[in-house]
Amino acid sequence: MSVALEQKQGLIAGDGLLPVKMAQYAKENGFDVVCISFSKDNLSQLKKYCSKVYSCHPGEINRIEQILKDEEIKQATFLGKVNKSVLLKLYKFDSRAIEILKSVKRLNDDEVMLLIVREFEKLGICVLDQTIFIKNLMIPAGVLGKHKPTEAQMEDVNYGFWLAKEMGKVDVGQS
């Protein structure tokens, strides 16, 4: 699926270097990045590449929605890790967050993320594929070492890939 990119991009940033790299690449390619950061770890780095950086807790839904509306964000990318220990600080959840979470059947990562995407869509915001602005960091498809895997080894790789995706769906530990 190809999507026409807006000049102004929203970035919902968790911990780590990926949100910073996304903002850097986007800025270098003429995009204006407005960031809502859930992390204090990379805040100073994000400020180098984003025109605005708002520090929020994931449970401040009313504030996040207002920022997105005020900034006229039409497209957003989620990048970076948000620890469940941060997410589960219930005292930081506003009434809108509690209302949204009540509609979740299970609090696994996939279900919560799909719910967030649907909420963004209700606001008229398209959640973009995470790889759009970081393709330059991705390993190309194909053989990476000196030896091409045998057919049996490729079957193992494909099975492992399928299994990791299935484990992610049911929220079983590190997949």
Predicted feature locations:
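Short gly/pro/ser/thr-enriched loop/turn and capping motifs at secondary-structure boundaries
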Residues: 19, 40-44, 61-63, 84-85
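Glycine-rich loop at the start of a catalytic domain that most often binds anionic cofactors/ligands
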Residues: 25, 47-52, 89-94
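N-terminal basic/disordered segments at the start of proteins
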Residues: 3-38
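N-terminal glycine-rich phosphate/adenylate-binding segment common to multiple enzyme folds
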Residues: 64-132
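Conserved active-site and cofactor/substrate-binding residues in soluble primary-metabolism enzymes
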Residues: 13, 17-21, 56-63, 107, ...
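N-terminal beta-loop-helix "entrance" segment that forms/cooperates
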Residues: 38-58
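Internal active-site segments that recognize and position negatively charged phosphoryl groups
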Residues: 116-129, 137-175
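Short coil/turn connectors at secondary-structure junctions
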Residues: 5-8, 29-32, 50, 71-74, ...
